[in-house]
Amino acid sequence: MRQTFMANESNIERKWYVIDAAGQTLGRLSSEVASILRGKHKATYTPHVDSGDYVIIINAGQIEMTGKKASDKVYYRHSNYPGGIKSITAGELREKNPERLLEISIKGMLPSSRLGEKQGKKLFVYGGAEHPHAAQQPENYELRG
């Protein structure tokens, strides 16, 4: 009798992918990257195991947003002091720290659990075209669509 294949840490092969964010739409890129980080693009995907690959995103400063999201979408954070709420629009965040904009978007699409945190640590975002991960021999990844 055959049994359903269940992946575990010992039989997972991880790859490194480089994705160029120049000219890509924020949400479409984020959902694709979140899927790669979770391992859903593999036939051996197992929900309770971190089977995803490493992702390097370059040119994060050239990401695009559709519609009026640059001026209307607001990100909030709080300092835990009374009256300590801070806000920044997506356009301001893209100018100030484009890497953080992509990280917030992608990590928001991962599960909010210990497994999701582990999957989020395999994401590396850089504003320019250079990255320090040449030793891992990353492959270029072509996005769908």
Swiss-Prot record:
User: Which Pfam families does the protein's record reference?
Assistant: Ribosomal_L13
For this UniProt record, the keywords arranged alphabetically read as follows: Ribonucleoprotein, Ribosomal protein
Q: GO CC terms for this protein?
A: cytosolic large ribosomal subunit
PROSITE patterns associated with the record = RIBOSOMAL_L13
Say which domain of life the source belongs to.
Answer: Bacteria
GO biological process assignments: negative regulation of translation; translation
Q: Which Gene3D superfamilies match?
A: Ribosomal protein L13 (3.90.1180.10)
InterPro entries attached here? Ribosomal_uL13, Ribosomal_uL13_bac-type, Ribosomal_uL13_CS, Ribosomal_uL13_sf
Single Gene Ontology MF annotation: mRNA binding
Similarity section:
Belongs to the universal ribosomal protein uL13 family.
**Function noted in UniProt:** This protein is one of the early assembly proteins of the 50S ribosomal subunit, although it is not seen to bind rRNA by itself. It is important during the early stages of 50S assembly.
The entry describes its oligomerization and partners as: Part of the 50S ribosomal subunit.
Name of the protein described by the UniProt record: Large ribosomal subunit protein uL13
Gene name tied to this protein: rplM
